[in-house]
């Protein structure tokens, strides 16, 4: 596994972008990183749900609002889609797996304080196979 190679190489941290293949494997690799003391950062909250230390991604509420504004401008005001500027965001949402955080010997409140200036919000989550599993508990 790639996770084994990263652990063997002694990396300080791992980042994986949003990728469904990696996310599917997360439940089988997150403990390898924890055992090695390696924080695993990812591009989506679903990875943190599956055991990664932290996921950081777009704030979907902000994205949806901005997208709706752009669509309304095109459909209602006749704006030309070809000249509608591309929008970017300078912050997002972080999701920290508190179980993994503790297993790595990190204090959640300290991690949260460090992340807050970079995010619209910092969420807490625990390891589960799906968001539905969390809602059932």
Model segments located where?
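Venus flytrap/periplasmic-binding-protein-like
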Residues: 25, 29-53
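Hydrophobic alpha-helical segments within soluble ligand-binding/sensing domains
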Residues: 58-79
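Extracellular/periplasmic Venus flytrap/periplasmic-binding protein
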Residues: 1-10
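Hinge/cleft segment of the Venus flytrap/periplasmic-binding protein
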Residues: 73-137
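Stable alpha-helical elements in mature extracytoplasmic
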Residues: 2, 25-29, 63, 67, ...
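Hinge/beta->alpha junction and helix N-cap segments in small-molecule ligand-binding domains
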Residues: 1, 20-21, 44-46, 59-66, ...
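Periplasmic-binding protein-like
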Residues: 10-22, 41-43
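Short, hinge-like loop/turn segments at secondary-structure boundaries
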Residues: 6-7, 32-34, 57-61
């Amino acid at each position: 596994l790639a996770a084994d190679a990263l652990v063997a190489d002694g990396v300080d941290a791992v980042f994986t972008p949003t990728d469904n293949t990696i996310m599917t494997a997360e439940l089988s690799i997150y403990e390898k990183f924890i055992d090695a003391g390696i924080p695993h950062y990812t591009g989506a909250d679903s990875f943190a749900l599956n055991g990664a230390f932290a996921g950081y991604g777009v704030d979907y509420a902000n994205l949806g609002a901005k997208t709706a504004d752009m669509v309304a401008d095109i459909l209602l005001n006749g704006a030309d889609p070809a000249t509608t500027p591309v929008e970017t965001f300078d912050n997002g949402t972080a999701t920290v797996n508190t179980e993994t955080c503790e297993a790595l010997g990190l204090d959640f409140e300290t991690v949260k304080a460090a992340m807050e200036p970079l995010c619209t919000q910092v969420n807490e989550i625990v390891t589960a196979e799906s968001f539905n599993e969390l809602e059932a508990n």
